[in-house]
From Swiss-Prot:
Organism, as annotated: Cucumis sativus
UniProt region (Disordered), positions on chain: 84-104
Lineage: Eukaryota, Viridiplantae, Streptophyta, Embryophyta, Tracheophyta
Gene3D superfamilies (alphabetical): Ribosomal protein S18
Pfam families, per the entry: Ribosomal_S18
Protein name: Small ribosomal subunit protein bS18c
NCBIfam families in UniProt: S18
Localisation: Plastid, Chloroplast
Keyword RNA-binding: yes
Amino acid sequence: MDKSKRLFLKSKRSFRRRLPPIPSGDRIDYRNMSLISRFISEQGKILSRRVNRLTLKQQRLITIAIKQARILSLLPFLNNDKNDKQFERSESTPRTIGLRTRNK
């Protein structure tokens, strides 16, 4: 290669390969709560495939397992522990209800 072309080549950086989030020995099952709970957000939502770093097949199996666990009441549908205080009615000023008069 010419010396001018070599200037633009980037050096290859070494990277550490990430371990898969689900080891090969783990079975994806609705009863395996320790595995399922890793793929649910704090609000109780199923995390996306990008966040989980799962394959398409694994994400489908996790989603089905979570939905089965919810139906069997092993998992809550929503986790609203934090948001309960947000929707409580606060002390507000009383409304003044007056008589409406029509101008003729």
